[in-house]
Amino acid sequence: MAYQRLYEDEDLEKKIYDIVLENNDYTDTLRINNHYDFHYFLSPFRHDLFIWYPFKKEGSLLEIGAGYGQLTSLFTQKVNRVGAIEDSQSKCNIISKRAEDSTVLLSDFDDIKLEEKFDYIVLCNVFEYAKSFVKSENPYVDYLNYLKGFLKEDGVIFLALSNRLGLKYFAGFKEEHTNQLFSGVNGYNNIDSVQTFSKSEITNIIDEAGFSNYKFYYPYPNHEFPQIIHTDKLINIIQDKGIDRYRDERILLFDEKKLNLTLSRENLSQYFSNSFLIELRTSNKDYPTDGMDFIKIATDRKEEFNTYTTIWSDGKVSKSPI
């Protein structure tokens, strides 16, 4: 059964469809429509969440809730085969246009008719809605267990989502899923269709679903437009947390940069990061990201100069072209 993501707008979807139908480059469109919603769906900076990740070139990836294909086109460059699932025909049409090398499937997210198993499964801003489409006593745990059935033996599930206790929500940002102030901080009172989680809450869900090998990443300033990918190893040591590129109307209750410095000194940054990117691994073998402790992404320059810098667990620093 299709469900309504609270941030969706039918008029905006029609505009996005028309833009995608007529353009392959959205630079002029974003200059004219310099609003968060257009950047969220069309900006190339959306790719930065995964542009650094060492996907297996010969691998396969399933993106559940691919939206308007804002990440799908990147995945087709990273792996051999990409499947994208959406629950509305209009979204499927947009994805097909933006990521022509992907296979797009119109499907409910809890009734996926695929026999193939994948190396990677990606959910970005979708897992939070599992209680809307999984009818069970424990929808989030049960949905993770359901997704395991589509993974290869050493596969990975990625969850990209906001932190219910993200610092920006205390500082005056509206919660993206509800367009309300403090809805997550206050525990989603009277909101039954969606919820985000604190670090301990999402960790409990992951543990209960039987995952014993997983890694938290902390995209800063958020997972929509990340410039820095922190990990538990260095999040409180390297105090650079990036600068938010897109700020909608908001209340400014305090200086987030200053409080971020305090949180780092108190070893608390991982609990108040605005977002999580979580790598859930189905085996206990070594993974290529084990030694990656910090990634800084630079894609705001001419394309030929785009790079990402990695600090590794052995102390080495590498710079790689994008």
Residue ranges, per PLM feature:
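Conserved class I S-adenosyl-L-methionine
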Residues: 57-67, 158-180
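Class I SAM-dependent methyltransferase SAM/SAH-binding core
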Residues: 77-103, 108-110
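Short alpha-helix
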Residues: 192-210, 214-216
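Rossmann-like AdoMet/SAM-dependent catalytic core
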Residues: 201, 215, 219-316
